[in-house]
Amino acid sequence: MARTKILVFSSDSSLFLLSIFSFIFLNINGVDSTHRVFPELQSISAVDVKLVHRTGYHFQPQKHWINDPNGPMFYKGYYHLFYQYNPKGSVWGNIVWAHSVSKDLINWIALEPAIFPSKPFDQYGCWSGSATILPGNKPVILYTGIVSPDPENAQVQNYAVPANYSDPFLREWVKPDNNPLVGVHTENPSAFRDPTTAWFDGGHWKMLVGSSRKHRGIAYLYRSKDFKKWKRSPHPIHTKAETGMWECPDFYPVSPRSEDGLDNSKMGRGIKHVLKVSLNSTRYEYYTIGRYNRVRDFYVPDNTSVDGWAGLRYDYGNFYASKTFYDPIKKRRILWGWANESDSQIDDVQKGWAGIQLIPRRIWLDPSGRQLVQWPIEEVEGLRGSELHMRNQKLDMGVHVEVTGITAAQADVDATFSFKSLDKAESFDPEWINLDAQDVCDSMGSTIQGGLGPFGLLTLASKDLEEYTPVFFRIFKAEDQKLKVLMCSDAKRSSLAEGLYKPSFRGFVDVDLSDKKISLRSLIDNSVVESFGAQRKNLISSRVYPTLAIYNNAHLFVFNNGTEPITVDNLDAWSMNSPSEMN
């Protein structure tokens, strides 16, 4: 569970006190992407629900705080999404498992919370977990229960089952009396959480639970023959030094020969596995691709898969606590991820809501076998409205051209850029890999003249570019003549407002540019820019809060600030409508 706890006041009349505290605190410490932790306090009531930066087609409740996506699954004709939710305010606290259902992953109906503190084994909290479909099409939820108050927060692993299996909405859930399934971890009771979807192999059900010891990230493996009595394996399935607490682990098979997803219990020759962990100390995630030894219950990353902080990420931006599930209807694996706010806590209280789930993504193994690729689920295309098509638009150095005819504040933009030569690619310094993203994108940003790039999109831009969020590429050549593509999403000019967290996000990616083309798709939605770049291999999500580039005053441009001319071969853009139902 992505735990972000903050100030607690009992009524709206305390807002003035909170404002004073926030002013002092933010001026001393600044604002960060995950918000600060105040262990002595629990919740704040929302003052109002403000809409100016509210998303139009991303998943979010009508009001209040959300964080981790939990237990996604498909059951009796409906997709289910549970999520960590504060029903009493727009900051972390009072967490329950909220529950929504959908026929298409786009339109959502909110139901009553499915799981909330009510038993001794979860009386202090119901934190993140997963769903598993047992034989006979019977769903079960595994989740972390908190059995002691702050500061200990001792954690156990529980399960819940539907009260009525014939109800496709699964409105009511029961917590059997034989909980907890797994008791408090004696070595680190406050860092033992977020059970995975279980898989069946060798006569046993198996699941992972995230943990840490002496700053070593750990994924413990548990086995059960009946899903009721669980025993820990003598050794973790995998560990890694200097990575800290592993939150929200995810472990699943991928096919080396097909884009189709696989059920978690699917095993076979050639099948690889993905282990993803969310790093509590950095608020980023990384994943490895490797081999699962089913007999010894070991996972070994491939030698081409970096294991640790420098590992591959699903998303190099504002993306955390992700969870995948197998969709048996369309035979695909779908990825959910949470994007926190990048404004201040006082902003969240004033607007009355915080947090979104990013657009669900289909995810599969690249043919190289070295990384995953992702794409928005096809259902999102049903929201497309008015459209514009740009063809063969040349961009010389310093040129930006507006993309008109769509609502730029709420759009889907899919572009292919090309260039005639790679000769102007600048030399790549290997040390850049280790630099902070802000430093890389500052020194090689959208306004800094280069050779091959920077070029890309200026999203959520004001007419005269006082505000804009650039998403762009810059191409380098390493000593071995291999190309390195830098992709950035840079929020530092996204808003004239002060007191915001305006990070630069970046990712370097190896991509085949033999055809001298590179792709970029951005889903733009008022305060979020989700970008899929470099042939679906590099993804960056940003939260931004423009003051001028809002509603009909938002603009979209293509640009080039490199000496090598760029051509927009194809650009297809659509205004995006809102779903007919959103919680």
From Swiss-Prot:
Top EC category: hydrolase
Glycosylated residues, chain numbering: N164, N280, N303, N340, N561
Reaction(s) catalysed (UniProt annotation): Hydrolysis of terminal non-reducing beta-D-fructofuranoside residues in beta-D-fructofuranosides
Signal peptide (from-to): 1-33
Annotated keywords: Cell wall, Glycoprotein, Glycosidase, Hydrolase, Secreted, Signal, Zymogen
Subcellular location: Secreted, Cell wall
Sequence similarity: Belongs to the glycosyl hydrolase 32 family.
Record protein name field: Beta-fructofuranosidase, insoluble isoenzyme 3
Gene transcribed to yield this protein: INV3
